[in-house]
Amino acid sequence: MGCFSKIAMLRQAALALALIGAGAAAGQAAQVAPHRAAYELTLDRATSASDVIDVSGTMDFEWADSCTGWTVKQKSAMTVGYSTGESAELGWNLLSWEAKDGLKYRFLVRDLQNGAMSDQFKGEAALDGPGRGGKAVYSVPDKKIVKLPPGTLFPTAHSLKLLENAEASHPLLWEMVFDGSDAKGLFGVNAVISPRLPQLSGGKLSSPLLATPSWRINLAYFAPEGQAAAPENEQHIDIHDNGVVDLLIIDYGTFRVRAKLTKIEPLRGPAC
């Protein structure tokens, strides 16, 4: 697995939290749950065809109300061990802001390898209106414009639609999503939403944020160009109706990475 692919693996794990965990509050004021969470990253399983034998790391996530929009902060670090005896130290940081009407988005993404920054993406994006297209303007690493097709959603708007579908027992959703996480930042996301999960008790974490209905959402990520038969990767997320994710599994075919919630705390909203 090349350097870029390794970092992209961690980026996709963190992206799932930004894509899901930021959106529940956007249209459901009674369930607003700005929060700070910590996750432990481990190797869930690997097939005999995989050269990955160990994964360990952490992922810190914060979602907050900024009055005019929603902010997401993430900091991730992961060590990947290979059957050759080599290992890679990977990191991924994200800071984003999305307007509450879902039409504007700003992002700053940094990829790290062995403690040094290997990539950086910065810019802003805007849609011409609900359901309409728009453009993303990158300022780092190079100045360029990415056209966004009609129907494109930003992460919070997408996650809101996911939870609306879950509440309404609508199991399928396909959308184009822009998040700025790489040089193109645009991808197709196919979602399959399970029926409501049974509410379990006696877990290691005790928080009112976890005492709410939840669903498992299976996400498949596709490149935006062409008609790819297979997704680049798949993810399985257990999410509560307040937007809190307590389990994330990233499936790369020959191995899976698990992100398990280890700490959760609510954040106070601002005095807008």
Each predicted region: which residue ranges?
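Bacterial N-terminal signal peptides
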Residues: 12-22
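A short, structured loop/turn motif at beta-sheet edges
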Residues: 28-34, 62-71, 97-103, 207-211, ...
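Beta-strand elements of well-folded, non-transmembrane domains
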Residues: 41-45, 61-67, 78-82, 96-100, ...
